[in-house]
Structures are given as C-alpha cells and as structure tokens.
C-alpha cells in the first residue's frame, strides 16, 4: 500500500455529509484543504478513498473493540460506500444529510450479535454517542496484548498479505487503544509499513539480520503509541481531576513560552480551542477530536506571521507531520522590546480592584506575561508561581495596605526558584558522584530517560543547568506522578499521597517531594519466601550481568524485587544498614555461585545477609 502524502486539512466534520461545492465527494471536501496546500495535489481519488477507509476503521475498531477485523472492514466499507453514492447517484437520500457520527453509530446498531450495545442503540443522540463512549475500555487485559512474531514469519505474512496488513495493523492498534488520537494511529501505520518494506526487502539475503532490522526500527512504531498514549492519558487525567481551569492554565503557560510574540488575545483563543479539543478527545469523540485538531492547525498556520517565526517549515508539511513538527518546534525569540520584569502586577495601585472584578483574566494576563519572559522555567514551575501570585493577592487585598504585603511576593519568588535550583543541583551532584547506576535506581521505571538527562544537563554551568533540567526532567516527573496518582485511584496508597494527588496540580511535585514515612504502614513479616534467590543470580554472561547491575543499582547491589521487599519489611532502614547488606549480598553471591546446590546455599546465607536489619 502506498504511503499517503496526507495534506494539512483532514477534517471529519459533524456537519452534513453532502456539501454544495465543486468537490463532489463530501468526505474529500473534508479531507482536502481549501486549495492552498500543495501537498493535496498528490492525493488521487484512490488515495482519498483509502484514507477515508482508514479513518472509518479506526473509529469502528475503537467503538466496537470486540469485533473481528472482517466486521470492522465491513462497517467501514458501508460508510465509505454511502459517501460515494451520496455524491454520484443518490444525492437526495436523507441519510446523505445526516451528521457523520449519526451514520457511524447507525451502522454499528444495524449489526447483529452486538448485545453489549443494545441499550446504547435504544437511546437518541447525543445520549447514544455518550453511551457508546462510556463503553470504551482501555484497561490492560481487556484485549490480549500483542505477541511478538518471529521475524521470518512476519515477513512471509507481509509478502502474502501486503495490501491488507497495514489495515489489520490499524485495526489491532485502534481496538487496544480506544482513546488514542487517530492522527497518531495513522502516523504509526505509515512507519509500520515502512519498517515492513525495509526489513523484509532483503529477507532472502543471508547477510541481512532480520531480527536486528526489526529491533532497530520497531521503536518508530511502538514509541509514539506508548508516549502519545501516556501523554493523552496524563492530560485527560488532569482534566478529569482538576478541571478545565487547570488545563487552560497549563496550556496558557506552554503556548506563551512557545509563542512569546503572540498577543494575549491570540494566545487565549488558542488556549480555549485546545482545551475544547482535549475535552472532545478525552471523551473519545474521534470525529470532533480530529476536526478540532485540524482547525487549530489551520488557524496557527494561517496566522503564523503574528504567532511564530519558527513554524513556517512545519506549516508546509502534511498534516500528520505538521502537528508533531509544531509541538516540537523551538520557542520563538522574545520580542526585542519586552521588559525583563512584570512589576506592574505587584506595584500597580489598581491591582486589587482588577483582581476583584476579573480574577481569572487578571491571573491569565500575569501567567501570559511571566511565561513569555521565562522559557527556561518548566510549565509546572510557572503554574506554581501563578498559584503563589493568586494566594498573595487573596491575602494582600484583604488588608488595608496591599502595597507592603505584595512587596514580599518577589522575595517568595526568589526563594522558590532557589529551592528548585537546589533540588536540581543535588540530583546532579548525585549523578556526578555515583554515576548512571545510582541514578537509575532512583528512577527505576524511567531509567534510560533520566540518565540521558543527567549526562546532558549536569555537564552544564549553573546558569544553564536549571533551564536544561527543568525542560527535560519536569515533563518526565510530571508523567511519573500522574501515573502514581492514577494508580492511587484504584489502589489507594495512603492519605498523604491522596492529599498530594487531589489538592493542587501545580503543587503536586513539591508535595510528593515532602512526603514522610507512612507511620500507619504495617511492615511485612519476615517469611522464608520474602527473600528468595535462584540460579539466574549467578549468570556470567556480561550482557545479563550488566542488566542485573542496572536492576540492582549502585551502590545497592540488590535485585529489584528484593529492594522493594526490603523497604516494605524495614521502611525505616538506614543508609548504614543498606551498605552492610550490600557487602553481605555480594559475599553471598560469590560464595553460593561456587556451590553445587546454589539455591540451598542462598536459602541458608540470606539470613546472614539480612542480619544487619534482623538483629
């Protein structure tokens, strides 16, 4: 299947299916831009039909996750055939003027053997659509995970089913990720097809390593699904937990940093549009999500002269590349006449009056002005500054002399920046002293990203350390904390974690950083199976040993499960005790790996290893 040179105007609108224009195919009208995009010239009728088919398959697979590939294809063909008939021979058909989501849901409801959706199909729109959305299930295990195929078998399958395989890939990804943005799925499908073509092209070449080829290229396919899915889940989690106001504040900060030359009106319009897009996307409404996304991109590129000088090349790209390009574009240069400070938000005599009359607008202007001046700060840090400013005005405007009260705001700000810099400096000191292994042990799940950030940022001077670390670390830490809080919802940890996850998004990281040992936690009992070791601990293969070292951490040479159980057994363990156990663990490993019955030796010597905390 040819790689589609998609243009910048994919628009699956909820408007009428038939539109009176020169373009006869209504879907084509929504899939092709208004004649300004040169890339559209590369889309022939067959490619447009293929693109419509893919979009329909994504929606049906996400809505009816249990359907077979054949059933999804059948429904997608029914919808695309209707679109074709509406423009050629049956323009007066009443269904041709129905919204697309009505047509999609009616197609599902006409299918047999779908008892799960009977109640939804009995409802009227928009309640029917909401019912369908509520049945989407993204939990692990709802659909069996992907099984990694043998490379040779995969290439054989590709050669025999080359034209249908990309569609099958779209189907499998869509039903496992019912909330994943359709543009992401379309994009990774292109990468998947390219990977299969490239790796299987030389399958008969004896010098060609198929496994290595797939191993090298698979991240281009898997990484966007995982990362975009995580970011989307994270954003939707913020929206659900903290509401639209928090999402708007976060986007206001990010857009102001990215486009410092854009005026306040333009920025707030983008903020509102993006917040509305996330509401539709987080509901799982793919049609509205794609329409919102396209309209935002169209607005940004149409008004790029007043938004940013860094996105011209992005706006010349096809849609699927355009969106990613703009998101990853560097921040535009700050206006030459931009003052270094925003003292008017502290010193202005009418500040309390404006705060009382238009609180959210005043705070938005402060965040906008402060963020566009400080691209070196993370979005989370700027939100904390905004929260501090709001609290300051809440307090000071109630007093008789707000001037004296507000003047201390600058000192509070300096203190917060200093504390943030100190955290970064401490982390880098640990990195420089202990190296990668210890750093990986501190951030077990996100090891590779953290060590990359450490090696990149910790070599810089102090004045450049904070910008580098804030930009890279804060997003990663924010994603980690978001995942912790989502897990806390289903498996509560303790009241302190609940407070950090619920009270304030902006203050979540410092709140988590100040958590103490849970005094109500009941330690695990010491049982024979709590610390068990097997022969694989004695591996001599360098690669496995290296992996195990990464798993153990340095200086704590303990396996990941043992480390967890150790802390659960002795939550108040000291650094001295950890050091003693490290030495004993190393000695135990060296001794028992020489024995004939290694596991019996481990079972006996583990008590000696744990003696520093058992005495």
Curated annotation (Swiss-Prot):
GO terms of molecular function:
metal ion binding
Could you tell me which InterPro entries the record lists for this protein?
Answer: ALB/AFP/VDB, Serum_albumin-like, Serum_albumin/AFP/Afamin, Serum_albumin_N
Kindly list the GO CC terms recorded for this protein. cytoplasm; extracellular space
**Residues covered by the Albumin domain:** 27-218, 223-415, 416-609
Presence of the UniProt keyword Metal-binding in the record: yes
Q: Where is this motif: Cell attachment site?
A: 14-16, 283-285
Instruction: Give me the disulphide-bonded residues.
Output: 109-121, 120-131, 155-200, 199-213, 236-282, 281-289, 301-315, 314-325, 396-405, 428-458, 457-468, 485-501, 500-511, 538-593, 592-601
Q: What is its main location?
A: secreted
The signal peptide here is 1-15
**Which keywords label this protein?**
Copper, Disulfide bond, Glycoprotein, Metal-binding, Nickel, Repeat, Secreted, Signal, Sulfation
Asked whether the keyword Repeat is assigned, the reply is yes
Q: Which residues are glycosylated?
A: 137, 157, 472
Q: How does it assemble?
A: Dimeric and trimeric forms have been found in addition to the monomeric form.
Family that this chain belongs to: Belongs to the ALB/AFP/VDB family.
State the name under which the record lists this protein: Alpha-fetoprotein
Organism listed in the record: Gallus gallus (Chicken)
């Amino acid at each position: 299947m040819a790689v589609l040179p998609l243009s910048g105007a994919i628009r699956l609108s909820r408007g009428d299916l038939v539109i009176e224009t020169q373009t006869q195919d209504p879907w084509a009208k929504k899939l092709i831009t208004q004649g300004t995009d040169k890339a559209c010239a590369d889309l022939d009728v067959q490619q447009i039909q293929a693109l419509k088919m893919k979009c329909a398959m994504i929606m049906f697979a996400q809505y009816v996750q249990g359907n077979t590939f054949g059933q999804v294809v059948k429904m997608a063909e029914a919808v695309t055939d209707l679109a074709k008939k509406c423009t050629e021979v049956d323009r007066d058909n009443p269904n041709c003027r129905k919204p697309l989501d009505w047509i999609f849901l009616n197609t599902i409801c006409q299918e047999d053997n779908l008892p799960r959706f009977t109640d939804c199909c009995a409802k009227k729109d928009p309640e029917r659509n909401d019912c369908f959305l509520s049945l989407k299930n993204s939990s692990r295990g709802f659909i069996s995970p992907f099984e990694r195929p043998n490379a040779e078998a995969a290439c054989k399958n590709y050669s025999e089913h080359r034209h249908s395989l990309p569609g099958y890939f779209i189907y499998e990804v869509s039903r496992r990720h019912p909330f994943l943005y359709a543009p992401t799925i379309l994009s990774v499908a292109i990468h998947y097809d390219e990977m299969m073509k490239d790796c299987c092209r030389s399958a008969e070449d004896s010098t060609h390593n198929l496994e290595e080829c797939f191993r090298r290229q698979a991240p281009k396919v898997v990484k966007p699904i995982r990362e975009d899915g995580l970011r989307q889940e994270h954003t939707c989690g913020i929206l659900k937990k903290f509401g639209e106001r928090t999402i708007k504040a976060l986007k206001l900060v990010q857009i102001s940093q990215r486009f410092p030359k854009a005026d306040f009106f333009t920025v707030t319009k983008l903020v509102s549009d993006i917040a509305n897009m996330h509401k539709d996307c987080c509901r799982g409404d793919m049609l509205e999500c794609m329409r919102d996304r396209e309209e935002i991109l169209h607005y940004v590129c149409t008004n790029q002269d007043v938004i940013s000088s860094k996105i011209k090349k992005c706006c010349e790209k096809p849609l699927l590349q355009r969106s990613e390009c703009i998101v990853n574009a560097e921040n535009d240069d700050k206006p030459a006449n931009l003052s270094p400070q925003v003292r008017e938000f502290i010193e202005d005599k009418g500040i309390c009056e404006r705060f009382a009359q238009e609180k959210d607008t005043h705070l938005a202007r402060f965040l906008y002005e402060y963020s566009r001046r400080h691209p070196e700060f993370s979005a989370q840090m700027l939100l904390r500054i905004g929260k501090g400013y709001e609290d300051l005005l809440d307090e000071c405007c109630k007093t008789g002399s707000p001037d004296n009260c507000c003047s201390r705001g600058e000192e509070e700000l300096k203190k917060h920046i200093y504390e943030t810099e100190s955290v970064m400096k401490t982390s880098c000191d640990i990195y420089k002293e202990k190296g990668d292994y210890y750093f990986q042990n501190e951030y077990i799940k996100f090891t590779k990203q953290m060590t990359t950030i450490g090696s990149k940022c910790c070599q810089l001077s102090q004045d450049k350390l904070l910008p580098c670390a804030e930009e890279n670390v804060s997003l990663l830490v924010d994603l980690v904390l978001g995942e912790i809080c989502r897990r806390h919802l289903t498996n509560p940890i303790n009241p302190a974690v609940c407070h950090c996850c619920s009270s304030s998004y902006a203050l979540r990281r410092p709140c988590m950083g100040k958590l103490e040992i849970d005094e109500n936690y009941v330690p695990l009992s010491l049982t024979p199976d709590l610390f068990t070791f097997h022969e694989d601990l004695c591996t001599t293969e360098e690669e496995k040993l290296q992996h195990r070292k990464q798993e153990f951490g340095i200086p704590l040479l303990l396996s990941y499960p043992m480390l967890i159980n150790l802390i659960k057994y002795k939550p108040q363990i000291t650094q001295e005790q950890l050091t003693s156990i490290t030495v004993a663990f190393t000695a135990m490993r060296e001794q028992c790996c020489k024995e004939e019955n290694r596991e019996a030796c481990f079972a006996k010597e583990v008590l000696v290893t744990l003696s520093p905390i058992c005495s």
